[in-house]
């Protein structure tokens, strides 16, 4: 699938400060490795607009509310892009959003509004404690299924090699000639 090719990428928020989990952080329950986080959690006030990092096509946009017992994404958007150097597809993922402004199949440009960071303990936030954006970059195969926010050791539907440090990916992409 050929998606639009962004000439440059931008960060999804003007203030990119990781206030929650960061990419690759190992999450433990007691002393047991429970999972590895697959993106950056950027803590910002609820209502902060979230924008697309580059030209692309929306491949997923929906509300996955979950519950207070089984948390989920809330509002999630996944955008497909074509890398300008490798010509390979990659995907930007934005989770815990309210007021989604895009639909599947829509072609969007850099900076296009996707939604806003949702309030804590709401369906749009997926019932998480702190309002934040989960931002991730996925370079694996698109199978038209929801992508996870973390990788558990016993999970085999994703691989760590398919996930990139999102801030480093954006920075490196913009330095390539």
Where are the regions a protein language model picked out?
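Solvent-exposed coil/turn segments that connect beta secondary-structure elements
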Residues: 47, 82-84, 138-141
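Short glycine/threonine/proline-enriched tight-turn/helix- or strand-capping micro-motif at secondary-structure
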Residues: 18-52, 61-63
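Short hydrophobic beta/alpha edge segments that flank linear recognition/processing sites
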Residues: 76-79, 109-125
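Short, well-structured beta-strand-loop connectors
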Residues: 49-60, 102-117
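Short alpha-helix capping/helix-loop boundary micro-motifs
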Residues: 43-44, 94, 99-102
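Residue-level detector of beta-strand face positions
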Residues: 41, 49, 78-80, 136
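Acidic, glycine-rich catalytic/binding loops that coordinate metals and/or anionic ligands
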Residues: 4-9, 14, 103-109, 116, ...
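Zn2+-dependent peptidoglycan hydrolase active-site motif and core
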Residues: 52-98, 128-132
């Amino acid at each position: 699938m050929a998606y639009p090719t962004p000439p440059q990428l931008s960060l999804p928020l003007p203030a990119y400060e990781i206030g929650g989990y960061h990419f690759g952080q190992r999450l433990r329950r007691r002393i047991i490795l429970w999972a590895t986080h697959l993106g950056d959690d950027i803590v910002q006030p609820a209502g902060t607009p979230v924008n697309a990092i580059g030209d692309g096509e929306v491949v997923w946009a929906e509300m996955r509310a979950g519950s207070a017992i089984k948390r989920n994404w809330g509002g999630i958007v996944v955008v497909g892009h074509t890398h300008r150097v490798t010509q390979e597809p990659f995907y930007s993922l934005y989770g815990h959003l309210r007021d989604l402004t895009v639909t599947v199949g829509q072609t969007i440009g850099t900076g296009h509004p996707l939604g806003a960071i949702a309030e804590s303990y709401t369906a749009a936030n997926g019932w998480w404690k702190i309002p934040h954006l989960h931002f991730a970059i996925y370079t694996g195969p698109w199978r038209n299924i929801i992508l996870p926010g973390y990788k558990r050791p016993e999970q085999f539907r994703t691989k760590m090699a398919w996930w990139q440090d999102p801030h480093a990916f954006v920075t490196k992409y913009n330095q390539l000639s």
